[in-house]
Amino acid sequence: MEIAAVIPAHLASRRLPRKALIKVAGKTILQHVYERVKSADKISSVYIASSDDEIIEEVRRFKADFIKTYRYHTSGTSRVAEAASNLNAGIVINVQADEPLISPELLNQMAAQMVKDGSIKILTPVKKIRDTKEIQDPNIVKAVFDKNLNALYFSRLPIPYESGETYKHIGVYLSLIHI
């Protein structure tokens, strides 16, 4: 089954404008994300989806594939959906453009799980919060799920809980595509 990754990128981020083009260790955050996703061996193809000419120019500079999208998307997910409609992939991975440390092994594990278990339609990872300051941080998306690990909701606000454990979302989504 063809597995494609799409990295939605734009310059108008509300919390940190132009973050995709910020340089870290000599490369843009976007290039770091692309290279890590590209190194996941279960992913057949990687595209950057953007409407911003400056991002497209940067993508061309580091020789990545891209899909030019509609300018007025309200979310990265809608940008990925537009890009995915132009692809011939059974599974599409949405990797946020601000995840420069995304683990290629995590992407491989998620892709393998999605292929193995045909009942999964959407898959997204979470990680236990160990630093209690992250619970109050609106930049950290907290996740709530049921006993079967089905997501119930996500929030930037602290989540009231009884278990004493809080989880944060990692900016990756795998979706099974029916064309």
Which residues make up each language-model segment?
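Short, high-confidence coil segments that cap the C-terminus of an alpha-helix
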Residues: 43, 89, 118-120
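Conserved small/polar residues in nucleotide/adenosyl-binding loops
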Residues: 177-179
